[in-house]
């Protein structure tokens, strides 16, 4: 795994990448989301088994994140063309179908390296999840081994907890979103 530049309490590594947004290609930069929280999650590859369940789960809950002033971005080492092909493949045929979140292409693997999730021997990303606050500061890092996905509810809970502590200082455990 690459060591990366992502550190809790420090500015999140900046990025610029081509994404598939609403079925079209668009350049996306971290600075586009200044003033908003960002949940940035990495997944290994398109057209795999666990990845679509996570991506669809985040997409289905995108509005819950938007209500918190938070955007969700998915990233893999696949190209924007592969992302679009996966999105254009119906869910019943192993595809994603239409999404409510952007998928970023990291074909150079720079984002995966910068965020420390690159599995260098395979050239793919571990399942990393990063929460970045509205000032661009990295607040949370989780990296899972390849077979285990992330919980959308836990990501929502963490965003709510960080937003609460931003406003009120330290707080209780925040058991649920």
From Swiss-Prot:
Subcellular location, record wording: Cytoplasm
Broadest EC class assigned to this enzyme: oxidoreductase
Keywords, comma-separated and alphabetical: Acetylation, Antioxidant, Cytoplasm, Disulfide bond, Oxidoreductase, Peroxidase, Phosphoprotein, Redox-active center
Keyword Oxidoreductase: yes
Gene Ontology molecular function, alphabetical: thioredoxin peroxidase activity
Family matches, as Pfam families: AhpC-TSA
Catalytic reaction equation(s): a hydroperoxide + [thioredoxin]-dithiol = an alcohol + [thioredoxin]-disulfide + H2O
Enzyme Commission number(s): 1.11.1.24
Keyword Disulfide bond: yes
CDD domains: PRX_Typ2cys
Residues annotated as catalytic: 51 (cysteine sulfenic acid (-soh) intermediate)
Organism domain of life: Eukaryota
Chain positions with N-acetylalanine modification: 2
Positions of the Thioredoxin domain: 6-164
Coiled coil: none
UniProt similarity note: Belongs to the peroxiredoxin family. AhpC/Prx1 subfamily.
Record's subunit section: Homodimer; disulfide-linked, upon oxidation. 5 homodimers assemble to form a ring-like decamer. Interacts with TIPIN.
PANTHER family hit by this protein: PEROXIREDOXIN-2, THIOREDOXIN PEROXIDASE
Note: The active site is a conserved redox-active cysteine residue, the peroxidatic cysteine (C(P)), which makes the nucleophilic attack on the peroxide substrate. The peroxide oxidizes the C(P)-SH to cysteine sulfenic acid (C(P)-SOH), which then reacts with another cysteine residue, the resolving cysteine (C(R)), to form a disulfide bridge. The disulfide is subsequently reduced by an appropriate electron donor to complete the catalytic cycle. In this typical 2-Cys peroxiredoxin, C(R) is provided by the other dimeric subunit to form an intersubunit disulfide.
Known function: Thiol-specific peroxidase that catalyzes the reduction of hydrogen peroxide and organic hydroperoxides to water and alcohols, respectively. Plays a role in cell protection against oxidative stress by detoxifying peroxides and as sensor of hydrogen peroxide-mediated signaling events. Might participate in the signaling cascades of growth factors and tumor necrosis factor-alpha by regulating the intracellular concentrations of H(2)O(2).
Protein name stated in the entry: Peroxiredoxin-2
Organism: Pongo abelii (Sumatran orangutan)
Gene expressing this chain: PRDX2
